[in-house]
Amino acid sequence: MLRLVSDENFNGDIVRGLILRRPGLDLIRLQDIGLEGLDDPAVLAWAAANDRILLTHDRATMPDFAYSRVTAGQSMPGVFVVNDRIPVRQAIDVLLLLDICSEQAEWAGLVLYLPL
């Protein structure tokens, strides 16, 4: 099972759908733990400190900050960049498939753009 965190701009319908379809999913929303307003490097640092793969729609800046952590030798558990133009159901299906078929450690240091 993957340990996930969604950034504050991640589609709430996707988050709700994930939780409805898999109630035991280990998913935290940053805004639910009082961490809204953090910049990208701080979000990635929190995700790394808590060993959580980041869910984001931010393909403009988040991947660059993620790879900067990797090249600096810092921990980066992974980032899933979900295209915000795909149907909500497709995003949910893809994320649940990754949760079922992969392990947390497989995504360390990687940025995955979804859908594939």
Give names to the regions the model predicted.
Residues 28-30, 55-56:
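Short, conserved beta-strand edge motifs with alternating hydrophobic and charged residues
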Residues 2-25, 31-35, 41-44, 66-116:
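Acidic, PIN/NYN-like endoribonuclease modules and their adjacent C-terminal/linker elements
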Residues 40, 48, 52-65:
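Acidic, metal-binding active-site segment of PIN/NYN-like and related structure-specific nucleases
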